[in-house]
């Protein structure tokens, strides 16, 4: 069941496009892109979430990420 977001699809898509443009501008390979994005998530959690909630937020994020992974074999 999809979650309802307080953000519009337009807001999400615009920010996603801008982030992808930065990665493409720097010709970042997939592994570097994932490393940088992972570090960004870690930094956001550590600087914006109360310590008592960080583990739960990280677990929720990891679960949502795993649920969104496409299983088809196309590369």
Curated annotation (Swiss-Prot):
Any coiled-coil regions, as ranges: none
Cited SUPFAM superfamilies: YejL-like
Residue ranges of the TM segments: none
Cysteine disulfide links: none
Domain of life, source organism: Bacteria
Pfam family, one: DUF1414
HAMAP family attached to this UniProt entry: UPF0352
Family note: Belongs to the UPF0352 family.
Protein name (database record): UPF0352 protein YejL
Species of provenance: Shigella flexneri
Source taxonomy: Bacteria, Pseudomonadati, Pseudomonadota, Gammaproteobacteria, Enterobacterales
